[in-house]
Amino acid sequence: MTIKDFGGRIASVWEGLRPMTRSMLVGALQTSGSSSSPNIKAPKFSYDAHADWELSRLLSALDEQSRTTDAQNDAETLGEMNKLADTCASLLETQSGSAEVFIQLAERALRRHDYKKLDRLADRLSERFSAGEIAEIIRQTESPQIRAIAYETLAMLPVNNVAPLLDDSLYTDIAAAALEQKAFEYDSEEAKEILDQFDADAFRRNG
């Protein structure tokens, strides 16, 4: 079976991959064997923002094609397609720190009702993502479940990681909500003090 058997769009996306990204995928497929391991070892290739974009685009094409009637009626092709898609997803899970990619992976887990995967993604969020990227997830996502996960993670970060976002107009409300959660659900006096100071500064500016 070749990549062309997956359909024209997937073949086109595959042909557009850089050689290093294709090699990374092939190596990851060989590592995972016949199983869809959630913990593919980090590939011995350079990973950059463009690889992020390439893998995300390929995963979107694979997931979209796998939901078509033609794919659903061909078990062998569907199985191979899902194997490649799971490999893309696992690489993105272990390597990416992008808000857009996190949303894509979390939405994929929700579609599959894969709540163990969603829990792993939540763990990755606290390990790999900056406060700004977590706030960007909250800003972009339309999913209440994903927003709740991101807010919970943001509220668990140190106050000095979240507080600077109060000065960014894109994230002011998000940061304030996360600090309120930290102050009242986690009894953080530091968060309460930051919020009190923020409210006082806002009052002076508006007064």
Region locations from a protein language model:
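N-terminal "cap/leader" segments of large eukaryotic alpha-helical scaffolds
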Residues: 2-33
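Short, charged low-complexity linker/loop segments at the C-terminal edge of domains
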Residues: 187-189
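Terminal, low-structured helical/coil segments at or just beyond the last alpha-helical repeat
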Residues: 191-207
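Structural detector for internal amphipathic alpha-helices that build alpha-solenoid repeat scaffolds
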Residues: 27-31, 40-60, 72-97, 107-128, ...
